[in-house]
């Protein structure tokens, strides 16, 4: 990986995401295995000794969403009870009955892995995919979207820098997309491990991704808006209840 190559060559590194997770081998829907970023954080000692820097999780989500959480902590709240990163859109892609606007490979990884949650006094734990259903009314005309718990880097990063009682990430998939993802899992098409197809080794997930339109080519067909933001609940600087959604809309 480029991350390790930079470490070996004493080169600074920046990434928009973090190293992948691996579910707990026996209790995937309740206990953490290898969390997002664990493999990179485990190398911190060597980067420190070499005097080089790696900035990971620095995109919009994660990245800007984490900055929103820290801003709320320092400028808006005296106590934070809950931080929920909420992502939703009303984007449609003209000419396609089904065409994800984001990498289906990554979407499967995020949405079918056990969602990660952090709570004060309990730490990190996992739950079942598509749990915690919540309809959130997104701003700037996007409107209400059905959101569910999803594994995401913010739940690893925010508790390390912000004192909150609970941190979670919810993705606005909508009922139709949730059904599609459940069907993909039921058919085994989410598997990364290769299977033999008439003498050819093929990963079902890679095959699925190759069968769908490349999101990078769909920009001119996309209509609507997408929103990434951080919902913070707690007490303001005067001790009064407050809830704020800090967001970015494209």
Give the location of each predicted region.
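Flexible, glycine/proline-enriched loop segments at strand-loop-helix junctions
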Residues: 31, 55-60, 141-147
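C-terminal catalytic/substrate-binding lobe primarily of soluble NAD(P)-dependent oxidoreductases
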Residues: 74-250
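Rossmann-fold NAD(P)-binding glycine/threonine-rich loop
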Residues: 3-9, 16-52
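Glycine/charged-rich beta-loop-alpha catalytic/anionic-binding loops adjacent to active sites
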Residues: 11, 47-54, 243-250
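Adenosine-phosphate binding glycine-rich loop
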Residues: 35, 39-90
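Short acidic, glycine/serine/threonine-rich loops at helix termini
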Residues: 26, 66-68, 94-99
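Hydrophobic residues in well-ordered beta-strands that form the structural core
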Residues: 14-15, 56
């Amino acid at each position: 990986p480029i991350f390790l190559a930079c470490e070996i060559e004493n080169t600074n590194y920046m990434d928009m995401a973090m190293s992948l997770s691996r579910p707990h081998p026996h209790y995937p829907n309740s206990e953490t295995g290898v969390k997002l970023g664990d493999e990179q954080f485990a190398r911190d000692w060597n980067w420190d000794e070499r005097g080089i820097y790696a900035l990971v999780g620095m995109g919009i989500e994660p990245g800007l969403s984490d900055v929103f959480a820290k801003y709320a902590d320092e400028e808006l709240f005296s106590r934070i009870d809950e931080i929920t990163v909420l992502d939703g859109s009303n984007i449609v892609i003209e000419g396609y009955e089904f065409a994800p606007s984001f990498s289906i490979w990554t979407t499967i990884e995020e949405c079918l892995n056990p969602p990660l949650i952090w709570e004060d006094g309990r730490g990190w734990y996992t739950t079942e995919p598509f749990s915690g259903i919540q309809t959130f009314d997104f701003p700037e005309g996007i409107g209400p979207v059905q959101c569910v718990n999803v594994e995401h880097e913010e739940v690893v990063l925010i508790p390390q820098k912000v004192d909150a009682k609970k941190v979670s990430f919810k993705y606005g998939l909508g009922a139709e997309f949730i059904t599609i993802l459940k069907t993909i899992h039921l058919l085994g098409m989410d598997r990364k491990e290769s299977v033999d197809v008439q003498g050819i080794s093929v990963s079902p997930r890679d095959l699925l991704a190759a069968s769908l339109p490349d999101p990078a080519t769909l920009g001119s067909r996309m209509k609507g808006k997408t929103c990434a933001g951080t919902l913070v609940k707690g007490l303001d600087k005067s001790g009064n209840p407050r809830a704020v959604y800090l967001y970015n809309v494209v």
